[in-house]
Amino acid sequence: MPFTRKNLKHDLEDYGPRFDGAPDLEFRAATKALDLEQSGLTYQRVPPGYRFPYGHTHKTQEEVYVVVRGSGRMKIDDEIVELEEWDAVRVPPGAWRGYEAGPDGLEILVIGAPNLGEDPREDVEGRRDWWAD
């Protein structure tokens, strides 16, 4: 049975600097690198106190956010959820979501299914400053 192995920190390009936010935001997409067919995977490191500038929703994709290090908060539609290490949060299609890091930063894995194919932007809608205090 064929398999694919990649190191999320060393083998994948960091797209974080392409976002118009914190310069030390880290965003590594593993879906294509791992040849995933049924799901998607990203690793994100959010600097302390930083709120991701965009909220987003998916038409068809369900996502699970797994906190591997740090803490933070997540806004899902109108509800705020506190996050700590090894929390897993499932977000269904159609729900708006955004997140921010706590004082020690936030590292998350995001698993999505189904795989969104060659143009994932067809499934997603995003809004800048969606989560405003």
Language model segments and positions:
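Short acidic-glycine-tyrosine-enriched beta hairpin
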Residues: 78-94
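Short beta-strand His + acidic residue motifs that chelate non-heme Fe in jelly-roll/DSBH
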Residues: 54, 74-75, 91, 97-103
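A short, N-terminal "cap"/entry segment at the start of jelly-roll beta-barrel domains
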Residues: 1-39, 48, 121-133
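Short, conserved beta-strand element in jelly-roll/cupin
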Residues: 43-47, 57-75
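A generic "binding-loop/recognition-motif" signal
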Residues: 60, 79, 95, 104-105
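Conserved short histidine dyad/triad with adjacent acidic residue
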Residues: 23-29, 42-58, 93
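Double-stranded beta-helix
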Residues: 3, 98-133
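Short, charged/polar surface micro-motifs in flexible loops or helix N-caps
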Residues: 36-39, 47-52, 71-73, 80, ...
